[in-house]
From Swiss-Prot:
Homodimer. One of its GO terms (biological process) is protoporphyrinogen IX biosynthetic process from glutamate. Its EC number is 4.1.1.37. CDD domains: URO-D. Belongs to the uroporphyrinogen decarboxylase family. It is an enzyme of class 4 (lyase). This is Uroporphyrinogen decarboxylase. GO terms for cellular component: cytosol. GO terms for molecular function: uroporphyrinogen decarboxylase activity. The gene is hemE. Keywords: Cytoplasm, Decarboxylase, Lyase, Porphyrin biosynthesis. The keyword Cytoplasm applies. Pathway: Porphyrin-containing compound metabolism; protoporphyrin-IX biosynthesis; coproporphyrinogen-III from 5-aminolevulinate: step 4/4.
Length: 372
């Protein structure tokens, strides 16, 4: 993507995140955390108890708004991310999503044969109205009485491949045996699933943008389980199909697009050339090496090991400094969004997040002062 946005930034009290995504100068490195609204927060657990179930929480715009804002009320984070789940799209396709206590997501009607695949189609987006209502509700809560928004709101979806994994396996998997069997035995059926998924994800993200999402992120959580060659054909090609269809701006403002492939370091250059604005990195990557490989043609997001947050405060600060030093001093046309290399653990001490966020802002401000 080009470094010069074709549209301006929306009026926000804090637009660091959007500026970094578009590789524009920032006063400090912006920070937000994957799963920042989650079980590590006592207030989240209280709201979850009121909702009665995870889906009761995710499908209620009022509750979704409440939990989206909870980490922002605790920490000076630079972005909000919609509280939802990546599996809402296949649920709207009729696969029957449920969350069993202690077992994670499960589909009642997984895709197992040609007849199942033949019935698959892009769902009516009205079935996902609760998501778009939540986006609009969160935006209103972030900007009460017409004031500038506190921070931008990120919408998201799972990637076509990651959704397909759940849709074929019927649940999470340790060996991906069912989905890879289908991929190798009947690649025609796998491509059909991925085509439908890509068009569904594009429609879903565009609807989030229309509802008020100011950036969108594609989570390719299972992309890294594919072999070289298979990743390009069955994951990246369909992520690119999504990106080609996405709105690049809304209401005259740029809408940055982030792609995160867990375990995707081998294909960093190809992901950077996919058409996204930002590439998310897991904790196995060296930020400086990644920046050297892709140059400044995209911004980078990441990539602290989430388990660093179980260390003592001094060690957290040291690891934050190491990560920021690894990326290097910001320069014209570069962009870095600090994040974890994967979602935050439910067991994380909340005080550790305070240490992390403060360390990112303070150390990156020092970096800019030294560079200046």
């Amino acid at each position: 993507m080009t470094a010069t946005p074709t549209a301006s930034l929306p009026p926000l009290a804090n637009d660091r995140f959007l500026r970094a995504c578009l590789r524009l100068p920032t006063d400090v490195t912006p920070v937000w955390l994957m799963r920042q609204a989650g079980r590590y927060l006592s207030e989240y657990r209280d709201t979850r108890a009121k909702a009665g179930s995870f889906m009761g929480l995710a499908t209620n715009p009022q509750y979704a708004t409440e939990v989206t804002l909870q980490p922002l009320d605790r920490y000076p984070l630079d972005a909000a991310i919609l509280f939802s789940d990546i599996l809402t799209v296949p649920d709207a396709m009729g696969l029957g999503l449920s969350f069993a206590q202690g077992e994670g997501p499960r589909f009642a009607h997984p895709l197992r044969d040609e007849a199942d695949v033949a019935k698959l189609q892009v769902p009516d987006m009205e079935k996902l109205r609760y998501v778009f209502d939540a986006v609009a509700s969160i935006r209103r809560a972030l900007a009460p009485a017409g004031a500038p928004g506190r921070v931008p709101l990120i919408g998201f979806s799972g990637s076509p491949w990651t959704l397909a994994c759940y849709m074929v396996e019927g649940a999470g998997s340790d060996d991906y045996r069912l989905v890879k069997t289908l991929l190798y035995r009947r690649p025609d059926l796998m491509h059909r699933i991925l085509e439908v998924n890509a068009d569904a994800v594009a429609a879903y993200l565009n609807a989030q943008i229309e509802a008020g999402a100011q950036a969108v992120m594609i989570f390719d959580s299972w992309g890294g389980v594919l072999a070289d060659g298979a990743f390009q054909r069955f994951s990246l090609a369909y992520t690119e199909r999504v990106l080609r269809q996405l709105k690049k701006e809304q209401g005259g403002y740029r809408v940055p697009q982030i792609v995160f492939t867990k375990g995707g370091g081998l294909w960093l250059e190809a992901i950077a050339d996919s058409g996204c604005d930002v590439v998310g990195l897991d904790w196995t990557m060296n930020l400086g090496a990644a920046r050297a490989r892709v140059g400044d043609r995209v911004a980078l997001q990441g990539n602290l090991d989430p388990n660093v947050l179980f260390a003592d405060p001094e060690q957290i600060r040291a690891e934050v400094a190491r990560t920021l030093d690894s990326y290097g001093a910001p320069s014209a046309g570069s962009g870095h969004v600090f994040n974890l290399g994967h979602g935050i653990s439910q067991h994380t001490p909340p005080d550790s997040v305070s240490v992390l966020v403060d360390a990112v802002h303070s150390y990156s401000r020092q970096q800019r002062g030294a560079a200046g």
